[in-house]
C-alpha cells in the first residue's frame, strides 16, 4: 500500500486538496462580499 493512499484513509488532505480548499474559501469570501455590497445597494435604493 502506498503512503499516498494511507494519507487519504487517515483523512488528511493532500497538498493539492488543501490548496483547492484555500482557493475555494477565498472565492466564497469574495462572493459573500459582493453579495453584501449588492444587498446594500438595493436596500439604499428602496430607502
UniProtKB/Swiss-Prot annotation:
Residues 1-20, 25-47 are annotated as: Disordered. Residues 25-40 have a biased composition (Basic and acidic residues). This is Putative uncharacterized protein DDB_G0293796.
